[in-house]
Regions:
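Conserved short acidic donor-positioning loop in nucleotide-sugar-dependent glycosyltransferases
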Residues: 33-34, 288, 316
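Amphipathic terminal alpha-helices
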Residues: 26, 343-378
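N-terminal Rossmann-like NAD(P)+-binding domain of SDR-like oxidoreductases, especially those catalyzing
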Residues: 1-217
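Non-catalytic, hydrophobic alpha-helical segments
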Residues: 265, 269, 285, 296, ...
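Conserved C-terminal active-site "lid" loop/helix of NAD(P)H-dependent oxidoreductases
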Residues: 262, 317-338, 359
């Protein structure tokens, strides 16, 4: 499989993946719409990600919602790595048609073409998301393994941000979420990613194509957009700090995420492309370590040597999860995947990269006003 199509290949994960595959002598085609939200008004000037790949790949400016663009991009390919997606969890709650059209509709178009036209595709690798788990797996002292429902506005407005047992109502203990955990997304983005993965795993085996899915945790590292206020708290916090603006920590600052470095994500994805035994499997990709958001903010201020006010405000967004971190046992077993980048090591590299970039316009307040207007920010 030496001819590989990467949709969203000018994005953060896609561009890094493309460059690594080129190093491994793959012929890479990229299909990307160069979304303004990610790449700016003039990608030639404002998108280092696009510039890093545009002369090294067969680049097609187009959309996964266009059958014509898919047909052009799929010509001569052996495999597809489908990364193109709208990715803002909060934004998905009020731009519903956009998220469903791109994430579900784009995947449906791909599968329709593969089902009804001649092609050489042997494997489809699709990016799902940890968002499909919703709150994920927990343990209750009385009820054992449980999967909490979405947190209630009536609890959070009183400062009770932790998850409750759906059976007895007690607070529950976070544990690592495995791939066979209950699927219970709490955002439109999560629902779209769930359906995207289900479509691929349902259709591909019927047409002789191997499906492989990755549920990425919170991916970060050099190259990620510093101007997009809808995804990535490391970028959001960094842009706030560099502009001398304070950081508003949602909830109580104890909410956690599993932050996984871009190089580890690229490594896992290539293993999923190349490993025969990966066919038909879904893999978590993370570090298996939970880091709280307050620690992220303090660490970034320390790395940049800039002090800004850090306020734990008690504000919250409907649709956000409280905690999640991945169990990566399956990826270790089948793919031989082992994350090499700890959070401390990764954030050091990320901060060094940010220090070399132009300070971006801080659009965070604009995104908050949008969510307030939709009743999603409390």
């Amino acid at each position: 499989m030496k001819n590989v199509l990467i949709t969203g290949g000018a994005g953060f994960i896609g561009s890094n993946l493309a460059l690594k595959l080129i190093d491994k002598s793959y012929q890479v085609t990229v299909l990307d719409s160069l979304s303004k939200q990610i790449h700016g008004d003039n990608p030639e000037e404002t998108s280092p990600l696009y510039r890093s790949v545009k002369d090294k790949v067969r680049f097609i400016l187009g959309s996964v919602t266009s059958r014509e663009d898919w047909l052009k991009a799929l010509e001569g390919q052996d495999a597809v790595i489908h990364l193109a997606a709208e990715t803002g969890t909060g934004q998905s709650m009020y731009e519903i048609e956009k998220y469903v059209s791109s994430n579900i509709g784009g995947t449906a178009l791909l599968l329709d073409i593969l089902t009804n036209t001649k092609h050489n595709i042997k494997r489809v690798v699709v990016a799902e998301s940890r968002a499909i788990y919703g709150e994920g797996k927990y343990e209750c002292s009385s009820c054992g393994e449980v999967y909490p429902l979405e947190r209630k506005d009536e609890d959070m407005c009183k400062g009770d941000f932790e998850c409750h047992c759906p059976k007895c109502g007690k607070h529950v203990k976070l544990v690592a979420t495995t791939e066979d955990s209950a699927i219970h997304p709490s955002s439109v983005y999560g629902v779209a990613k769930q359906v995207q993965g289900q479509l691929v795993h349902l259709v591909c085996p019927t047409i002789g194509v191997d499906p492989v899915s990755f549920r990425y945790q919170n991916v970060y590292g050099p190259g990620q957009s510093l101007s997009n206020p809808y995804t990535g708290i490391l970028s959001i916090f960094s842009t706030r700090i560099k502009n001398g603006n304070g950081i508003n920590i949602f909830e109580d600052g104890k909410e956690t995420r599993d932050f996984v470095y871009i190089d580890d994500v690229v490594d896992a994805t290539i293993r999923g492309l190349e490993t025969p035994e990966a066919a038909g499997h879904v893999f978590n990709v993370g570090t298996g370590v939970a880091t709280d958001v307050l620690t992220v903010a303090k660490t970034l201020c320390q790395k940049y040597g800039i002090e800004v006010p850090i306020a734990i405000s008690g504000n919250y967004r409907l649709g956000d999860i409280r905690h999640n971190f991945a169990d990566i046992t399956l990826a270790r077993k089948i793919l031989g995947f082992e994350p090499r980048w700890s959070f401390d090591k990764g954030i050091e590299q990320f901060a060094k990269w940010v220090d070399k970039q132009e300070i971006q316009e801080d659009k965070y307040d604009m995104s908050i006003e949008e969510m307030k207007a939709k009743g999603l920010y409390k």
